[in-house]
Amino acid sequence: MFAKAFRVKSNTAIKGSDRRKLRADVTTAFPTLGTDQVSELVPGKEELNIVKLYAHKGDAVTVYVSGGNPILFELEKNLYPTVYTLWSYPDLLPTFTTWPLVLEKLVGGADLMLPGLVMPPAGLPQVQKGDLCAISLVGNRAPVAIGVAAMSTAEMLTSGLKGRGFSVLHTYQDHLWRSGNKSSPPSIAPLALDSADLSEEKGSVQMDSTLQGDMRHMTLEGEEENGEVHQAREDKSLSEAPEDTSTRGLNQDSTDSKTLQEQMDELLQQCFLHALKCRVKKADLPLLASTFLGSHMFSCCPEGRQLDIKKSSYKKLSKFLQQMQQEQIIQVKELSKGVESIVAVDWKHPRITSFVIPEPSPTSQTIQEGSREQPYHPPDIKPLYCVPASMTLLFQESGHKKGSFLEGSEVRTIVINYAKKNDLVDADNKNLVRLDPILCDCILEKNEQHTVMKLPWDSLLTRCLEKLQPAYQVTLPGQEPIVKKGRICPIDITLAQRASNKKVTVVRNLEAYGLDPYSVAAILQQRCQASTTVNPAPGAKDSLQVQIQGNQVHHLGWLLLEEYQLPRKHIQGLEKALKPGKKK
């Protein structure tokens, strides 16, 4: 369902009544969750957003977003968990196991065929047709997909594990997963087996060559029934998958030696020190605590890891920053009521100077390579000039006509060549050009045509450029240049008042610079922890505007200038950023 990009219709903060209804719906849909787990999944006070979108096939989907990650989605009044939720509650749904090579096809939009299932020693989970199920990979219980069973367990066994097993709705690495923090599945060890089962499983790992051949082509049967379904890669034996199982099991022991809370505390401090050492400069101070977290700490989180303060011992960012202040690394002040800012940093503190920037993991880089979106590169914007009807006679000798687009250097060359070809350079003063009838008609005002006989070169060229119509050329990476008349509109940032005297930040003209308003809205929603909406821009045909709750000009400016590297001259409204100490 989310194998291709979707279109966001709206993104708003959830109301109290809707939050209570969602809790009730979660309790009904997933009765195995306890009251505390439901409260953890649907928090009482933390921000929770409702995103309404259209999937690429037109299905209307409602997505619930908490902490920047989609946690649930609703389709045709049915509630489904995302992989982010299943990683926290891996036993929420009956789970079926497949081989790692199959994942690529599931991400591409294929359903899971029964030949791709791995039969566990205890047998397949008992499900009925239409039941919601999770799909995991051999060696790791963390689900990588969810789907609906196409038949009951009894029918699966009766069919000899042939045919369509599950209609897949959502997977790790699809576009719904990409709308979150893009973390990788955690390593969750398989459930413990008794000695008899362990012996049986160990024996099953030693596959003979015949069985390996059957496994290599197991998905081809499914492909006959469903053209989108997977085919195992010919250059990699599936016998490697069970070997990975034992390796993952060994690696899990070292990870389990520390509690999840201790691991999150270490990650929090690592991102904190990394951000101070590499991203924050003295000129950035004072720096809003929320900006420090959203624009600096999150970007320092290693690939495959998810920074979640709520899972640390600190629980809140303010408490963590107070601890760092006690260690005299930073100084924090409340410059406006309820809003904390970092006002000073001791960059000579031993913890900062001794901090070693971690190198990116080759494994995580490989895992994320296929799913990482191409980075944004600013367009090449070139000013041009368009030949109007009144200037046609001057430019037609050089092969140009009305409506031709020229660069400034081309205009200069054409005018100089015209003057020299027609012997218009003054013999007594080479810096002057005599004006013939064509030049008079093209560049002089009516009241000047009988008084001005000569012009200096610079004045002639300046007047010529002024008489031409402005135009511009935009070239986006990998695309053909786009040429338009007029001057390119800058990205326009404004502040507006809405109901209850609330401020919102509105940004327009993103499309002219190759930016997708929906993508920008999603990024700002996570960075600012504020609701965002995308609406048609008033008075502009086929143009959209992004609206963010509160004064978010600082976050927006950082995104456009620092991350997207857009020139400041193409952005207007940056001066409206909230000043330190000023109340929102």
From Swiss-Prot:
GO terms for biological process: formation of translation preinitiation complex. Residues 223-257 are annotated as: Disordered. The modification Phosphoserine is found at residues 237, 254, 361. Residues 93-173 form the PUA domain. GO terms for cellular component: cytoplasm. Residues 383-467 form the SWIB/MDM2 domain. Keywords: Acetylation, Cytoplasm, Initiation factor, Phosphoprotein, Protein biosynthesis. It is found in: Cytoplasm. The keyword Transferase does not apply. GO terms for molecular function: RNA binding; translation initiation factor activity. The keyword Acetylation applies. Residues 491-564 form the SUI1 domain. Residues 227-238 have a biased composition (Basic and acidic residues). InterPro entries: EIF2D, eIF2D_N, eIF2D_SUI1, Pre-PUA, PUA, PUA-like_sf, PUA_eIF2d-like, SUI1. Residues 247-257 have a biased composition (Polar residues). Belongs to the eIF2D family. Translation initiation factor that is able to deliver tRNA to the P-site of the eukaryotic ribosome in a GTP-independent manner. The binding of Met-tRNA(I) occurs after the AUG codon finds its position in the P-site of 40S ribosomes, the situation that takes place during initiation complex formation on some specific RNAs. Its activity in tRNA binding with 40S subunits does not require the presence of the aminoacyl moiety. Possesses the unique ability to deliver non-Met (elongator) tRNAs into the P-site of the 40S subunit. This is Eukaryotic translation initiation factor 2D. The lineage of its organism: Eukaryota, Metazoa, Chordata, Craniata, Vertebrata.
